[in-house]
C-alpha cells in the first residue's frame, strides 16, 4: 500500500459499486517498501498486559516512514519504510522502529536482509 499512487478510495468505490472496469489502472511507485512488525511481550504464545507505546512520533520523523498502529498487545504496530532500494528502505524501517518504546516488545531483525545485500 505504501507504493500505491492511484487513489485507493477510488479503486474501492469502483469495485464496491460494480464499476471496476471503469476504474483507473493501479499505479505503483518504483520505490521499494519494507515493513517490520513490533510485537508485544509473549507474542504469539501469550498475551502481555497492556503497556504504553511511546516514540511513534519520533519514528515517523524518519524520512520515508509511516507507522501503522494496531493495538497495545499482539502485533502492536507496523513500521513501513520506502526507499529507492531495499537497502535504503530496510535501513529506514529499522532506524524508525528503534525509536519506538514498548516494554517487553520484540521484532525480527532479519526482515528484507537477503534482498538488501
Where are these regions (language model features)?
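Active-site "cap" helix and flanking loop/linker of ATP-utilizing ligase/carboxylase catalytic domains
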Residues: 1-64, 68-70
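Generic C-terminus detector
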Residues: 72-117
Amino acid at each position: 500500500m505504501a507504493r500505491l499512487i492511484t487513489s485507493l478510495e477510488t479503486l474501492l468505490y469502483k469495485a464496491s459499486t460494480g464499476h471496476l472496469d471503469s476504474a483507473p489502472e493501479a499505479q505503483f511507485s518504483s520505490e521499494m517498501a519494507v515493513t517490520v512488525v513490533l510485537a508485544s511481550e509473549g507474542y504469539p504464545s501469550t498475551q502481555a498486559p497492556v503497556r504504553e507505546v511511546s516514540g511513534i512520533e519520533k519514528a515517523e520523523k524518519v524520512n520515508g516512514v509511516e507507522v501503522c498502529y494496531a493495538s497495545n498487545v499482539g502485533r502492536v504496530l507496523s513500521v513501513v519504510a520506502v526507499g529507492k532500494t531495499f537497502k535504503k528502505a530496510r535501513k529506514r524501517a529499522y532506524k524508525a522502529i528503534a525509536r519506538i518504546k514498548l516494554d517487553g516488545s520484540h521484532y525480527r531483525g532479519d526482515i528484507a536482509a537477503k534482498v538488501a545485500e
